[in-house]
Regions:
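Intrinsically disordered, low-complexity polar/charged tails and linkers
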Residues: 1-80, 84-161, 166, 174-195
Length: 195
């Protein structure tokens, strides 16, 4: 038996967004010698972990202090940063990575850095009838197979929002917080139509 009440009303569509992960890229305008970087990184205090196994992976995996943020380096000159808990955390991490790379590489330019994905969660505070929501949103925008995965997957234009029966939402695929907030608020409004 469900604890869903058809009369449930949300005080606010979105109570609060919590950023779970910010992912981004830095592009250096040159190829990287990953073996040489791995050797050098092993000696750096600001890098807490270095893994380079070219037989298994084509990238160099590192963790940067102080909070073990994951940073992967690719031979093509790209660098991926994952695990930042906010945009405010991402920007100084880019600075830390660039500071290390400036000491190791010869470049005068400012490497391009951009956020490629923000993962954020929200809690609507009330249970959601996922079967009814599937009908409201339409099968072309929704995947819901409860025997395989406990959430409804809503596909927006350039994002995905997982909707859990508990009222929790997880949004991924967008690159700025305003867009995330707008996407979650829009879906929250449509969820209200079925409760």
């Amino acid at each position: 038996q469900s604890d869903f009440s058809p009369g449930a009303v949300y005080d606010e569509v979105v109570t609060e967004l919590e950023v779970a992960n910010v992912v981004g890229m830095i592009t250096y305008q040159q190829e990287l010698d990953l073996a040489a970087l791995a050797e050098t990184f092993d000696e750096r205090d600001e890098i807490t972990d270095v893994t380079y196994e070219p037989a298994d992976n084509h990238w160099l995996q590192t963790r940067f202090a102080p909070d073990d943020t994951y940073v992967a380096f690719y031979r093509t000159g790209r660098c991926s940063i994952a695990g930042c808990r906010s945009i405010e955390h991402f920007e100084p991490m880019v600075g830390s990575v660039n500071a290390v790379m400036r000491e190791l590489l010869d470049f005068e330019y400012e490497p391009a850095a951009e956020i490629s994905n923000i993962v954020a969660t929200s809690d609507l505070g009330s249970p959601i009838p996922l079967e009814l929501l599937t009908l409201e949103l339409g099968m072309d925008a929704v995947e819901y197979e409860p025997e395989q995965f406990p959430a409804l997957m809503y596909r927006g234009t350039n994002h995905v929002i997982l909707v859990f029966a508990s009222g929790k939402l997880l949004c991924t695929g967008l690159t700025d917080l305003e867009a995330v907030s707008e996407a979650v608020a829009n879906l929250g409004g449509r969820i209200q139509a079925v409760v």
